[in-house]
Amino acid sequence: MFLLQKYDYFFVFLLIISFFSILIFSLSKWIAPINKGPEKFTSYESGIEPMGEACIQFQIRYYMFALVFVIFDVETVFLYPWAMSFYNFGISSFIEALIFILILIIGLVYAWRKGALEWS
């Protein structure tokens, strides 16, 4: 009971923001003109007529590199705050971070062995 009172302002803020978001999207949908034509279905390339097809299929290796990048980017996001507050947590936090890094290294080795990082 007392715990919920502490968050009353947050819930009111959340309701107000939700209401205004729905209101703004509804108004823009209602007020905006609907233009249907062939120009809507073409891609925009800096004012120049598009050359070739707009939808091309990328090779899977681009996605694999992007996936590995995202994994290690997320690792950096988690490790930076841990490194900044390392002295406050103690040895248990250090062991947990080592386990986290070990799991990511195992994933990197797995991707490397499967050839996901090869460009040929």
Curated annotation (Swiss-Prot):
Q: Does the keyword Plastid apply?
A: yes
> An example Gene Ontology cellular component term from the record?
chloroplast thylakoid membrane
What family classification does the UniProt entry report for this protein?
A: Belongs to the complex I subunit 3 family.
Transmembrane stretches in the record are 7-27, 64-84, 89-109
Subunit relationships: NDH is composed of at least 16 different subunits, 5 of which are encoded in the nucleus.
GO terms for biological process? photosynthesis, light reaction
Q: Which organism is it from?
A: Marchantia polymorpha
Q: How does it sit in the membrane?
A: Multi-pass membrane protein
| E.C. number | 7.1.1.-
- Record's catalysed reaction(s): a plastoquinone + NADH + (n+1) H(+)(in) = a plastoquinol + NAD(+) + n H(+)(out); a plastoquinone + NADPH + (n+1) H(+)(in) = a plastoquinol + NADP(+) + n H(+)(out)
Protein name from the UniProt record: NAD(P)H-quinone oxidoreductase subunit 3, chloroplastic
Q: Which UniProt keywords apply?
A: Chloroplast, Membrane, NAD, NADP, Plastid, Plastoquinone, Quinone, Thylakoid, Translocase, Transmembrane, Transmembrane helix, Transport
Compartment(s): Plastid, Chloroplast thylakoid membrane
